[in-house]
């Protein structure tokens, strides 16, 4: 990709991110689960937007997981356990401007399969 294409790709993601963020908000009972994916790793955190604090997080890099669908499913299972320990059974899924496809979708499906209502 050349520089112009990368700029356009990032600009489109930023526009999607603002559009999504304007419609989502999390609180203590139903936090916002925000995801970030780099080229190599996957991260997620549960955020209480009222207190502006992170309730819990998971770091795929520290756990040795890569940015693949199989690893995203494993991370989803582990993150669902962390959310249940914190007493959370419902959440709002913030895909952070990423398309709901591949790793982002696999993580969300794994959360749903493990009892977290999104």
Curated annotation (Swiss-Prot):
One of its GO terms (molecular function) is 5S rRNA binding. One of its GO terms (biological process) is translation. Keywords: Ribonucleoprotein, Ribosomal protein, RNA-binding, rRNA-binding. It comes from the Bacteria. InterPro entries: Ribosomal_uL18_bac-type, Ribosomal_uL18_bac/euk. One of its GO terms (cellular component) is cytosolic large ribosomal subunit. Pfam families: Ribosomal_L18p. Belongs to the universal ribosomal protein uL18 family. Part of the 50S ribosomal subunit; part of the 5S rRNA/L5/L18/L25 subcomplex. Contacts the 5S and 23S rRNAs. This is one of the proteins that bind and probably mediate the attachment of the 5S RNA into the large ribosomal subunit, where it forms part of the central protuberance. This is Large ribosomal subunit protein uL18. It comes from Helicobacter pylori (strain Shi470).
